[in-house]
């Protein structure tokens, strides 16, 4: 009987440490990207906010996006990404969806509540919801 009691106590302790099922940390509902085309430049107004919500550094997201678009650009003081070249919002949103699938979404539980971790030359997605650690291609 005591071993059963200990088992139940250990289970209770385990469940108290696990996050609640279905709980959302705020990263599950991402803001829409505000994309403006001014002349021959494309500006993403809320780029810094978007990167904060997915828990990725601006530099990493910018590097991926600019590499895929094959265009120069930079993040200004206001947190806006300024890209040299005219790109439609559909193209940018498609590329960011690919980035989310490859470098943000947990392959095990599909949660966006993850962090990107670099160990030596390897990159990993570490899920904060289920604890899974998935290797990804380096940027």
Curated annotation (Swiss-Prot):
Record PANTHER family: EUKARYOTIC TRANSLATION INITIATION FACTOR (PTHR23001), EUKARYOTIC TRANSLATION INITIATION FACTOR 2 SUBUNIT 2 (PTHR23001:SF3)
Quaternary structure, from the entry: Heterotrimer composed of an alpha, a beta and a gamma chain.
Family: Belongs to the eIF-2-beta/eIF-5 family.
Keywords: Initiation factor, Protein biosynthesis
Role according to the record: eIF-2 functions in the early steps of protein synthesis by forming a ternary complex with GTP and initiator tRNA.
Species name: Saccharolobus solfataricus (strain ATCC 35092 / DSM 1617 / JCM 11322 / P2) (Sulfolobus solfataricus)
Protein name: Translation initiation factor 2 subunit beta
One Pfam family it belongs to: eIF-5_eIF-2B
InterPro entries linked: IF2/IF5, TIF2_bsu_arc, Transl_init_fac_IF2/IF5_dom, Transl_init_fac_IF2/IF5_N, Transl_init_fac_IF2/IF5_Zn-bd
Superkingdom, natural source: Archaea
Organism taxonomic ancestry: Archaea, Thermoproteota, Thermoprotei, Sulfolobales, Sulfolobaceae
Single GO MF descriptor: translation initiation factor activity
């Amino acid at each position: 009987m005591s071993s059963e009691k200990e088992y139940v106590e250990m289970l209770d302790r385990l469940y108290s440490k696990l996050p609640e099922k279905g709980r959302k940390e705020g990263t599950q509902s991402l803001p829409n990207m505000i994309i403006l085309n001014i002349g021959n430049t494309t500006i993403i107004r809320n780029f810094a906010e978007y990167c904060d919500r997915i828990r990725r550094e601006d530099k990493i997201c910018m590097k991926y996006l600019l590499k895929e678009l094959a265009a120069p650009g930079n993040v200004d003081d206001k947190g806006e990404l300024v890209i040299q070249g005219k790109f439609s919002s559909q193209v940018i949103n498609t590329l960011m969806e690919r980035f989310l699938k490859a470098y943000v979404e947990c392959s095990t539980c599909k949660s966006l509540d993850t962090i990107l971790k670099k160990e030596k030359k390897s990159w990993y997605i570490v899920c904060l919801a289920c604890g899974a650690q998935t290797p990804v291609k380096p940027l």
